[in-house]
Amino acid sequence: MTIQLLPASILVTITVIAVLCLIFRWFGLKKVRSFYVWIGVLAVLGGAWAFLFPLAITADFGKDGDGAALRQMLIYTTGGVLGVITLGENHRKNSLEKAKNDQDHIRQVHAERRSRYTTAVEQLSSDKASIRLGGVYTLVGLVDEWLADEKTTPSLEERRKEGQVIINNLCAYIRSPFLLAERAEHLDIPYTKDLQKDFDGDIEKFDADKRAFARDKAALGEERQVRQSIIKAIRERLQDFGAPGSWSNFDYDFSNTLFFYSTNFIFSHFDAFSYFHGVTFTQNAYFSGAKFTEYADFSKAEFTKYADFSGAKLFTGNTNFSQAEFIRANFSEAKFTSADFSEAEFTWDADFSEAEFIRANFSEAKFTSADFSEAKFTWDADFSEAKFTWDADFSEAEFTKYADFSGATFEEKPIFERALGDKTCKARFACKAAPEDYNFEVSPDSPYKIETEEKEYNGVKFRIPKGAILFDPDGSSEQKDDNDS
């Protein structure tokens, strides 16, 4: 095969120029779109090679020659490559258009939500309860929308961030003062004023006062409905058939709130921070079966009616009830990791029967009637300087490590041993603790002392309450009862 120099030279020159065009496009001609450069270069190259290459190699264009077939093949190849590039460009354009449309849709959806959010927040300040309630339902729905919207907001963290903003607004509404709440106790009973006694027979003043009472009573009831609707919506989303709910990972700040209505968080899961610092519950507060897996702050809270935390699992995080005030409190079967009840005050019943503590601080707490029967203290049990004005029942309570009753005051004899039918329920103290970990030196002013006796285990002597059992926490149940001497 012989090479014709002229067509070969022209072909090489065109090819070099085409390659240089591509290089200049890459480094310099940024304003010219790649698609048009590639199309132009390939069209020129394809045509040049189809026309010149057969000539350069002196292909036979006769009837039986291969020149025409080679040229046709090069033309088809060039056309195919150009077609593929064109299809790729169309796909790119369609993808960009789709991405743009998706972004426009996302912006539209988010803008529409934020517009609804702004309107709903404004509705919360309306003087009409129905409008405020509508704002609440809108905000609740928006939180659910954000959490479920994986399409426009793929990041779960971002969805929760948007939801937390709305949760903060709902909590802020709960925290906001309502003037009539201070008169709730008066407005909750029927109108009792007398025409003659209170108004000297002035019927106009009597009727005006009665109408004002009815108006305020209705306004109080409406506001209760709005706020209880918020609490109900939160509670329903804090649980899912025993599992955490869709709203369990949000922080809740109810600090210094006046709950002038019954509060129900039964079986709720709080998997983030929950703040009830300084709150006042004027009606019953129900937290039975609730779970707090992060920090739960009830410090300086005031429970003026019944506080039910029975079966609550206040674990993983710390639980702070320091300086809280209770009338009647039920913590039976509750579980705590680190519970701080220091300086708490229990005006009437305090039921901690069968409760479980890893660390418990009741220092300087005040009890009227305290039931710690069958409670378990795995680590610290600090009752130093606590005051018990009535029953203090520790029968069948179990202390595994550290028990401190130093400086405590008992107005009645503390119970560490109690007969229950044919059974004698005795407190248990672990022999694995150091003898000095048990301190029963109550206050010198205490009318009743904790009577102690010496017991020995494997040659180590302990002083524990009289009638109590010294047991080995690593041994069998029979050893627990039979190893005191």
Language model segments and positions:
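Membrane-embedded hydrophobic alpha-helical segments
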Residues: 33-111, 115, 122
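Membrane-helix interface "capping/anchor" motifs
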Residues: 24-35
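Membrane-anchoring/interfacial helices and their immediately flanking loops
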Residues: 1-25
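Extended N-terminal export/anchoring regions of large proteins
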Residues: 16-17, 55-58, 213-216
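N-terminal leader/targeting and pre-domain segments
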Residues: 104-106, 111, 115-122, 127-133, ...
